[in-house]
C-alpha cells in the first residue's frame, strides 16, 4: 500500500533495462485481483509467475485472547488467505493456457511454529501453508505452487512500526540467537522466491521453504 515505494522500485527496474508496470490493487477484492492480472496480460501478453507477497496483521499478545475479535480475524484472513486464493484463481486460466506457471506464496514461520504478531496472523499463515498443498495438487501439471516462510526480516515497515531503537535491538537479537547469526533481509526472501521460479525447481511443487537463518530451531 506504499505507492511512492512502488513507483521508486518500478523506476529502478526500468533504469536497469527491465520492463515494468505498477497497478494498485487490494487483494481482498476479487475485482481488483482480476484487474491486476488483466493489466499484466495487456502489458506483457501472459503471466508466467505470481508471487503473493501482500500481507497484513494486528499486533496482539498471544496470552490476552480479548485483544482479538472476529473482525480482526476476518480482516487478516481476507488479505493473507483469501487474497492469495483470488490471485491464483485469476491467473489460473492464462497459466493453464500457456502450459506453465509458478506461484510462490510468501508466508511466515509463524505458520509453522505458532509465534508471530498475533494468533490470528499465525493462524492465517498456517492456512496459507495448507492451501499451498491443496492448490499444488489441484493445479498440476501446468502450475506449480510453493511457499516461502521468512523469519524476522529487517524492512522499513518494521522500523517505522517500532522505531529505530527497538528495530535495531530486535535485529541485534536475531543476529545473536539464530544459528547463522544473521538477521534476514528482503533480498534473502527474494532469492528464495526466485529459486522456485527457475528451471532447477521444475520438479518441485507443494513445498514450504523456511528462510529464517535457523530461527525456527530455537
What does each of the following model-derived ranges do?
Residues 88, 124:
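Active-site helix of classical SDR
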Residues 108:
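Residue(s) in the substrate-gating loop at a strand-loop-helix junction
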Residues 149-160:
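Short, flexible catalytic-loop segment of classical short-chain dehydrogenase/reductase
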Residues 3, 24-36, 70, 188:
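The beta1-alpha1 cofactor-binding region of Rossmann-like NAD(H)/NADP(H)-dependent oxidoreductases
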Residues 57, 62, 113, 176, ...:
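Short C-terminal tail/terminal secondary-structure segment
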Residues 93, 136-141, 202:
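Alpha-helical segment proximal to the catalytic Tyr-Lys
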Residues 33, 61-65, 69-74, 174:
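Substrate-binding pocket helix/loop in short-chain dehydrogenase/reductase
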Amino acid at each position: 500500500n506504499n505507492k511512492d515505494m512502488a513507483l521508486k522500485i518500478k523506476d529502478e527496474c526500468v533504469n536497469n533495462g527491465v520492463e515494468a508496470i505498477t497497478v494498485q490493487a487490494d487483494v481482498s477484492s476479487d475485482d481488483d485481483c482480476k484487474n491486476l492480472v488483466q493489466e499484466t496480460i495487456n502489458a506483457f501478453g501472459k503471466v508466467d509467475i505470481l508471487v503473493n507477497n501482500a500481507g497484513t496483521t494486528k499486533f496482539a499478545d498471544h496470552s490476552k485472547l480479548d485483544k482479538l475479535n472476529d473482525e480482526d480475524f476476518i480482516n487478516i484472513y481476507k488479505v493473507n488467505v483469501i487474497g492469495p486464493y483470488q490471485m491464483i484463481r485469476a491467473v489460473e486460466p492464462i497459466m493453464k493456457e500457456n502450459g506453465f506457471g509458478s506461484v510462490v506464496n510468501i508466508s511466515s514461520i509463524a505458520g509453522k511454529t505458532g509465534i508471530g504478531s498475533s494468533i490470528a496472523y499465525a493462524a492465517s499463515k498456517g492456512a496459507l501453508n495448507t492451501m499451498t498443498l491443496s492448490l499444488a495438487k489441484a493445479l498440476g501439471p501446468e502450475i506449480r505452487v510453493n511457499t516461502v516462510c521468512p523469519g524476522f526480516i529487517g524492512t522499513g515497515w518494521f522500523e517505522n512500526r517500532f522505531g529505530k531503537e527497538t528495530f535495531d535491538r530486535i535485529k541485534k537479537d536475531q543476529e545473536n540467537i539464530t544459528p547463522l547469526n544473521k538477521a534476514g533481509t528482503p533480498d534473502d526472501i527474494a532469492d528464495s522466491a526466485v529459486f522456485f521460479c527457475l528451471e532447477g525447481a521444475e520438479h518441485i511443487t507443494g513445498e514450504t521453504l523456511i528462510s529464517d537463518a535457523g530461527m525456527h530451531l530455537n
